[in-house]
Amino acid sequence: VTFGFGPGMFLKDGVDRFGLADRRPEQLAPLPAFLGDALQAEFSHGDLCIQACSSDPQVAVHAVRNLSRIAFGKANIRWAQLGFGRTSRTTADQQTPRNLFGFKDGTANILADDAAALDEHVWVADGDGPDWMTGGTYLVTRKIAMLIETWDRVRLSEQENIVGRTK
């Protein structure tokens, strides 16, 4: 189980609810808009992120259920997303899986055993933010719509042009 804190944990509507405003990392800021964004407010921002991973989805769901039960009356679930399967290649012996559009996804991901690359691109280094963030990381989540039925009607050559690589 991984926990992440959104900007609202530090300061929300100008109120320092938990005495943490002075500990907010400068880098924790709203993302700029992307061309074609159709973001929905109910799936945007938030104070706390919980990611529960398991080889058995029932274990992950049960963990989140227990946490939400404990937090009843103090916190509520704004939105949840169930995931499935390995969605990226993280070790040299893994094959790159295909996404729902049929394209390999994650081929260029940083490998879990490449400590230098992880230190450079994933983990917060000493001096790159508040001391409590050293060794931590940032998470960005964007819900996207994958219109598979529409995609399946697009010619292969056009799909490859859109994605920027061959299938």
What is each PLM-predicted segment?
Residues 1-167:
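Long, histidine/aromatic-enriched segments associated with O2/redox biology
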